[in-house]
């Protein structure tokens, strides 16, 4: 207490010090004192009230404890009295055993009396029930069946209570009601028949389906009641529990499975489209069934059955099993496509599970895949393998068909622009297009894979196409009279190359929508180079045909006959122009190159004739006439090829300038200026060789041996450098060795 007092005093001093920190606060001392007095009185009042409340609670608790003690003593006394009375009445209870047995027997007899009417009328009730079942009066039949079962179960239960070990009486009762189980089974068959046709019945006679569901629900309640009694007594009547609700769902599951499997009406042998037809029937049946189940069937079942959800799950599982069975079969490529398209796309589309009439109960995002990823992958691998083989076979067949067309006696068809073509590009890319459209139905990834496959096989196909074009040319060269339309079909082969290039670009643009996909495609071997090579060889073969016809006239050049007035160049120009009338059927990119090559080749053949030393001029007059003739003929060739190249926007005159430059060397009258003129010629045409110069000087006929030697040796000391864009023209001209040996003589 002293410690507490000291703490109180210290606290009070501290509070007073806090109140009186300024001089002006001294005037308020009395005010502070009254306020603190009021606070003290208030605290003391609250403290007294709390203590009083605690005291009242303690007083009440003590009173209740005292009453409880008195009650315990009274109960203890009562228990002692009961125990005493029980000990005194043991003998009396044992003497009442006969009374107890009589009570049990009375209970059994009362049950027998209560069911007496039913017992005597069992045969009649059985007949009535049988008739009701046969006439489809299922509710009334079930009511009578319940009466029979109730009588039987009541008697058996009383017998069980009296003497559970007496099997003889139990068997007697069971035998007497033996027809009951048969009626139950017969009724169940009728119920299952209705349930098997529930989707049809609900449209025609929904009342019948409701009756079936009511019967099943009654049986479920009876099952639950009997199972509850079993926990207390251990007694279960025969045939219980029936579990008809569980059997109902089993029947529905089996019905769905049978319905889906039964939709296959055809086989591959009877109908090539059997799978497409089978899947379409499944789609239609399942969609119709689920719509009926959602809108009609669900109204015939209690909500807690969740019949639509159950049927949806059953249909999904049955479909998954059916799709797995189909996937396990040895399917063809088109059948794999049909199956995967249906499984991956159709199933979740608005044509089936995504149908608006099934929403919102059916959410396609929550549906499990019908086929596992491994099965889908295996099917895709099989499809790609089969497709590869098919594409190779299709391309081979298309090429064989095109080769047969090359041998025809009639010209190939022309496109809308008048260019010759064959059906090969259209056939090939129509096939590619069809397969890509099919792959796109399955997935974007498969579409890309199929496109890459098509491009790969196209690359291999073009190599074979090139080989066949070469064989076609070789066969023609062995007998130039056959095939009859060789030129026209070779033109078509060249045009096909341009068509192939355009079709490849179109195919990529249509089926590659992303740069990443473009990268995948471009990683394949480029086909432009192969196609250009085929076109180049084709154009070369056509030019070879031209120059084979010109060979006789080219051999007249630089001969005595030519110098005296041969019309060889006139014939050459007419022949070239005539051929290029046919070559007008070649598409522009290749025709332009072909004209340039023909121009170069014509000039080159003309120069080759110069280098053959077929003639040696004997006088300045002859050299002048020969040179002027060369210039005129160069102009003829220039005019011809300008005419052929009109419309391409490019001049191609430089080749003919070579003939004019050579003519200038021939025409020169002062031999002392030969070195300067030849030097100019060499500077313009760096690919000219010393044997070319020797042949040219030999053709002049006035250059001495020393002059030839000096000119050739001087030029060899400082060969000219060719410009990057220079196209060699002398490089391929070979001077016969005989002439070379005579050059310096």
UniProtKB/Swiss-Prot annotation:
Gene3D superfamilies cross-referenced by the UniProt entry: 1.10.357.50, Exocyst complex component Sec6, C-terminal domain
BP GO annotations: exocyst localization; exocytosis; protein transport
Main location: cytoplasm
GO molecular function, one term: SNARE binding
Domain of life: Eukaryota
Keyword set, alphabetical order: Acetylation, Cell projection, Cytoplasm, Exocytosis, Golgi apparatus, Protein transport, Transport
Transport is among the record's keywords: yes
InterPro entries: EXOC3/Sec6 (IPR010326), EXOC3/Sec6_C (IPR042532)
Compartments where located: Cytoplasm; Cytoplasm, Perinuclear region; Cell projection, Growth cone; Cell projection, Neuron projection
UniProt KW Transport keyword: yes
Residue ranges of the TM segments: none
Modification N6-acetyllysine occurs at: 28
Family named by the database record: Belongs to the SEC6 family.
Known partners and oligomeric status: The exocyst complex is composed of EXOC1, EXOC2, EXOC3, EXOC4, EXOC5, EXOC6, EXOC7 and EXOC8. Interacts with EXOC3L1. Interacts with BIRC6/bruce. Interacts with MYRIP. Interacts with SLC6A9.
Function: Component of the exocyst complex involved in the docking of exocytic vesicles with fusion sites on the plasma membrane.
Full protein name: Exocyst complex component 3
Species assigned in the record: Bos taurus
Organism lineage string: Eukaryota, Metazoa, Chordata, Craniata, Vertebrata
């Amino acid at each position: 207490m002293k410690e507490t007092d000291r703490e109180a005093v210290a606290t009070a001093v501290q509070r007073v010090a806090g109140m009186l920190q300024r001089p002006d606060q001294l005037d308020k001392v009395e005010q502070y004192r009254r306020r603190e007095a009021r606070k003290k009185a208030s605290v003391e009042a609250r403290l007294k009230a709390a203590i009083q409340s605690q005291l009242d609670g303690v007083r009440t608790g003590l009173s209740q404890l005292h009453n409880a003690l008195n009650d315990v003593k009274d109960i203890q006394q009562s228990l002692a009295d009961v125990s005493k009375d029980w000990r005194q009445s043991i003998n009396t209870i044992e003497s009442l055993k006969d009374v107890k047995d009589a009570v049990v027997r009375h209970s059994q007899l009362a049950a027998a009396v209560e069911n007496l009417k039913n017992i005597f009328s069992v045969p009649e009730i059985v007949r009535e029930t049988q008739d009701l079942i046969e006439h489809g009066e299922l509710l009334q039949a079930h009511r009578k069946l319940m009466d029979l079962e109730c009588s039987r179960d009541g008697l058996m239960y009383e017998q069980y209570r009296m003497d559970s070990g007496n099997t003889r009486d139990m068997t007697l009762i069971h035998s007497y009601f033996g027809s009951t189980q048969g009626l139950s089974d017969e009724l169940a068959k009728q119920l299952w028949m209705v349930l098997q046709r529930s989707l049809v019945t609900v449209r025609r006679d929904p009342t019948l389906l409701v009756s079936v569901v009511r019967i099943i629900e009654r049986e479920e309640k009876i099952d639950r009641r009997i199972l509850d009694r079993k926990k207390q007594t251990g007694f279960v009547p025969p045939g219980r529990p029936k579990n008809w609700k569980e059997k109902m769902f089993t029947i529905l599951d089996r019905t769905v499975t049978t319905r889906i499997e039964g939709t296959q009406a055809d086989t591959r042998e009877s109908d090539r489209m059997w799978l497409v037809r089978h899947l379409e029937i499944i789609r239609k049946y399942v969609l119709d069934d689920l719509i009926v189940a959602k809108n009609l069937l669900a109204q015939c079942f209690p909500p807690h059955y969740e019949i639509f959800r159950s049927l949806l799950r059953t249909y999904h599982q049955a479909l998954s099993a059916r799709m797995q069975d189909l996937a396990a079969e040895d399917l063809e490529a088109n059948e794999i496509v049909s199956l995967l398209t249906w499984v991956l796309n159709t199933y979740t589309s608005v044509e089936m599970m995504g149908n608006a009439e099934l929403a919102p109960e059916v959410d396609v995002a929550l549906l499990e895949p019908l086929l596992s990823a491994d099965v889908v992958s295996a099917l895709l691998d099989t499809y790609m393998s089969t497709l590869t083989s098919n594409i190779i076979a299709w391309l081979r067949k298309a090429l064989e068909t095109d080769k047969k067309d090359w041998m025809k006696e009639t010209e190939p068809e022309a496109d809308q622009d008048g260019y010759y073509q064959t059906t090969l590009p259209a056939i090939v890319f129509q096939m590619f297009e069809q397969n890509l459209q099919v792959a796109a139905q399955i997935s974007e990834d498969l579409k890309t894979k199929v496109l890459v496959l098509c491009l790969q096989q196209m690359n291999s196909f073009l190599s074979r196409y090139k080989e066949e074009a070469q064989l076609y040319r070789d066969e023609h060269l062995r007998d130039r009279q056959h095939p009859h339309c060789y030129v026209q079909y070779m033109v078509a082969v060249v045009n096909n190359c341009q068509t192939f290039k355009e079709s490849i670009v179109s195919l990529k643009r249509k089926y590659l929508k992303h740069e990443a996909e473009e990268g995948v495609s471009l990683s394949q071997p480029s086909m432009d180079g192969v196609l250009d090579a085929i076109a180049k060889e084709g154009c070369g073969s056509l030019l070879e045909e031209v120059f084979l016809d010109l060979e006789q006239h080219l051999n007249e050049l630089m001969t005595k006959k030519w110098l005296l007035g041969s019309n060889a160049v006139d014939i050459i120009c007419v022949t070239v122009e005539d051929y290029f009338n046919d070559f007008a059927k070649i598409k522009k990119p290749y025709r332009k190159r072909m004209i340039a090559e023909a121009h170069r080749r014509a000039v080159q053949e003309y120069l080759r004739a110069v280098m053959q030393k077929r003639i040696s001029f004997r006088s300045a007059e002859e050299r002048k006439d020969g040179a002027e003739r060369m210039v005129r003929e160069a102009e003829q060739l220039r005019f011809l090829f300008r005419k052929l190249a009109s419309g391409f926007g490019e001049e191609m005159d430089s080749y003919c300038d070579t003939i004019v430059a050579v003519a200038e060397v021939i025409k020169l009258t002062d031999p002392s200026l030969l070195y300067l003129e030849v030097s100019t010629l060499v500077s313009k045409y760096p690919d000219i060789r010393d044997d070319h110069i020797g042949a040219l000087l030999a053709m002049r006929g006035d250059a001495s041996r020393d002059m030839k030697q000096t000119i050739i040796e001087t030029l060899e000391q400082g060969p000219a450098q060719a410009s990057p864009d220079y196209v060699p023209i002398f490089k391929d001209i070979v001077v016969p060795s005989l002439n070379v040996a005579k050059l310096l003589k």
